[in-house]
Structure formats: structure tokens, C-alpha cells
């Protein structure tokens, strides 16, 4: 009991003395190197490994354009690497194309008042919660449910932090309480903690949730290594620490001469004034900005040219379609006109054929009535001779009438067929013209939509 009280007092004293990483901080960027994706700003009390995000203020709103991790602190200047902001990645939302620039604000420790706590048993869990009243500890039940029976990995812990807006993770290892940044997994603070009295541990850590099973395949891949609590979490923290040391050494291999030259250029606030009032040579930061802007302009130019080519192709296709439509209409009009003329000529021929039989009948009748009848002087023999002549004339009149009737019926049938074909042709021509007009209208609408 005495040991527990001493531990509580020690933890309370340490928590009161080291709370700088909990207070939110906002700093302004003083230097940007776009090719290397490095920014510099006043360090204040920032530590290596702390995570933040860059905010750019526009006309009437602000936008988060990138996230940063501090890689070095020297002479009151913090150096950080920045990358695309992916903590709230959502493929259905627009992706910002802006990058960090001088004058933007970097926000740190915005979520450091919320934390996950990984402890081996309920005693240490409640002890740490009681001695850190200024921290809002998210229930470990949520974290163990999120892991779904698998061993805690750094990638999974980062995802859980993003889901629940958590900034730090408290992990109990052998005789140590480690406070790590969620995003960089860098150790922000270490506190001594007596764990010699721990005889029984929970898997993967203490929580009130039981019965979560990853299944046979899940156990095969996860390995259930967290059953040995202290061995697993000691190795997890040391592994990440070795990784961060390697990253730090790799970042320190950046050309020191170039860094010193850049710092000197930034230290000179007032540019040298030329005698003739000429403009000064651009600084390294301005060159980097100009280079990045040229890249963006080149991309925009390529995109603009690609869109223009597409529009030109669409316009050319529309013009070709209109020309083909005009040619087709002209050809249809010529064919229709030819059919109409042929039909009119057929009608004229039939009228002439109808007039000729009538004229023939009149001529026959007139010839028959040329010789006057001499009733008083005509003999019976003359009457007998005239009778067969009249019968023959009637037969001749009947014969031409029957032939003309047949011819007339044939001509009427031909005329009916020609009229029917002409009507069918006109109907097909109208349908074809309507269909072409609809297609042309659809092409024009598509072209207008493409131009917009």
C-alpha cells in the first residue's frame, strides 16, 4: 500500500512538472524548401517527433494543406518534414493542391488532451488515470474493439487515433510509462513506473471487453504475440525508437552547407539596395516557389491543350456531320424532284392516250355520215349492201373501244403503283430527315456541353 501511495505522489509530481507538450501551440512558417519538403519555424518548446498540420488562410476560409513532423531542433529553430494531409483522407472530397508556404500557420498539440492508455492490468490503468486528471483518456474498450482481436501494430494504432481524434498514446512497459505521439510514434516523455508487482496481465492490454476472437486465420497472421505483455510492448517501443533514430540520421545527412546558407539568407531581413534601383536576385525560397509554380503552370497548360484538342475534334466531327447531312438532304431533294417529274410525265401521257380514242370515234362517225342517204332513189339492193358496211363499222368501233379500255386499266394500275411508290418514298425521306435532325441536335448538345 505504501508503495502504491509513493507511486501516486511521484506520478502526480511528474505530471505537474511536464505538461508542456499538452498545451496547443501555433507558429508561423519562416522558410520553405519545396523540392526537399522542409519547413522551418521558431521551436519554442517543441520536441523532435511532434506532429502538426499546416493551415493556409484564403479570402474567406481556411484550408488544411499538409501535415508536418519535426525532425530536428537546433538553436531555437525547428525543422520539419511536410507531406500531403492524409489524416482525414476521403476519396469523395476534393483533394487540395496547395502546398506549405511562408507565412502559413502550423498547429501543434491540438488533440494532445485526448489519449489512449495501454496498461497490463486494471490497477495500473486506474492509477495512471487518477494521476493524469488533465487528460481525457478514451476508453480502452473502444481501442480493443477497433483492433478486433489482432495484436496492436503501429499502423493500426495510428488509424485508431485518427478515428477517435486522439493525439497521444500512454503505453506501460517494464518500469516505464511511455507517452508517444500518435502520428509519428515518437516518445514525447518517459516516466518511471514500478511494474514489479504485476503478476497477471491482460491480452492484448487491459479492457472490459472479452471474447473478441480474430479467428484461426487471424491468429495465424497476428501470432498472438501480445499474450506476453511486457516483452511485446518493450519490443514495440524499442523497434519504433530504432526506426526513428535511423530516420533522424538519414535526415541529418542533408547537405549542412546548404542549410547554413539558407539560414543566413533568412537571417538577412533587409535586402541590399542597388544604386540604380534594380531588383534583387531572387532568394532560394523564391526560386523554389517559382519552380513549383512553373510545374503547376506546365500541368495546367498540358491540361488546357488536351481540352482544346478534344474540343477541336468534337467541332470537326460536328462540322463533318453537318456537311454529310446537307449532302444527304440535297440528294434526297434531287431524287424526290426526279420522282415528281416522272409522275407528272406519266400523268400527261395518260391524258393524251385518253384523248386519242375519243378523236378516233369522232372521225369514224364523221366518215360514216359523209354520204347522204338517197331514200327516194335507193333500191333495196343498195340498202342490203349498206347494211353489212354499217355492221362492220360498228364492230370496228367496238374493237378499238375494248383495246383502249384494257390499255386504260393498265395505265391506271401503273399510275396507282407509281403514286404509291412516290408516297412511300416521301414517307421514308421524311423519316430519314427527322432521324438525322435528332442526331444532329444530340451532337450539338454534346458539343455545347463539352465546351462548357
UniProtKB/Swiss-Prot annotation:
This is Plasminogen-binding protein PgbA. Plasminogen bound to PgbA is capable of being converted to functionally active plasmin. Residues 284-310, 317-373, 392-452 have a biased composition (Basic and acidic residues). GO terms for cellular component: cell surface. Residues 374-391 have a biased composition (Polar residues). InterPro entries: PGBA_C, PgbA_N. It is found in: Cell surface. Changing residue 91 to S: In strain: CCUG 17874. The gene is pgbA. Residues 265-452 are annotated as: Disordered. Changing residue 349 to N: In strain: CCUG 17874. Its main location: other. Changing residue 398 to K: In strain: CCUG 17874.
